[in-house]
Amino acid sequence: MLQQLVNGLILGSVYALLALGYTMVYGIIKLINFAHGDTYMMGAFIGYFLINSFQMNFFVALIVAMLATAILGVVIEFLAYRPLRHSTRIAVLITAIGVSFLLEYGMVYLVGANTRAFPQAIQTVRYDLGPVSLTNVQLMILAISLILMILLQVIVQKTKMGKAMRAVSVDSDAAQLMGINVNRTISFTFALGSALAGAAGVLIALYYNSLEPLMGVTPGLKSFVAAVLGGIGIIPGAALGGFVIGLLETFATAFGMSDFRDAIVYGILLLILIVRPAGILGKNVKEKV
């Protein structure tokens, strides 16, 4: 049981990184960026090529992949979402799905649909701590995820750009009147969320030693569930939701329900939307018409 708890926390930390990207973008512009899971996939492939082709150090490759996916996020926002800023929500939603398919099948065209083995960039060392067995890779994934979450919280709460993000999320028109560059703030939000997704992609590709162009579909959807579960638009809620989903999946597998673990996650989404639509940490607010 303790082993499953540890495994669930490690998986949940990656879901939390992904969910944070969803929740930040939604908090700023009320958009569900369904291409977010594919940014995670792009991060994994960028890390793969940097390590495999250039023999780059894993941690350097991780940082470069984060920078590259941050730029990708800004480009997607500028080309796909910014022109639709004042369009209907359904138009933006369809565009997000279109961007998702473009990234997925663009990569299928470029690299093929086959699953690739991620380079063994870090020598695995196993530690047996009583009933719990851990590897250095698992500990590293958990540590990096927690560090990135703490850094995100510091950026949002303590920096000038973080204050701008919070102002835009409350009222973008008022923020603009106060001299805040709304477009730059939204681009920065996409960059942050995409960088976290890129990091998650590299970490998971290393952990499972595999990657393929459609690897972001299921984790992307589950991370969306995590964001809704915790309270979409709320950063601590997204992190909490990620850990809860990771634990649910792990314990479902441990109790012999691995075939139903996806159904359990999506069932949680339906349940939370019926019982508490605002999420665990969210507050029910009536939308003004």
Show where each model-derived region lies.
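Membrane-embedded helix boundary and interhelical linker motif in transport proteins
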Residues: 6, 28-75, 79, 255
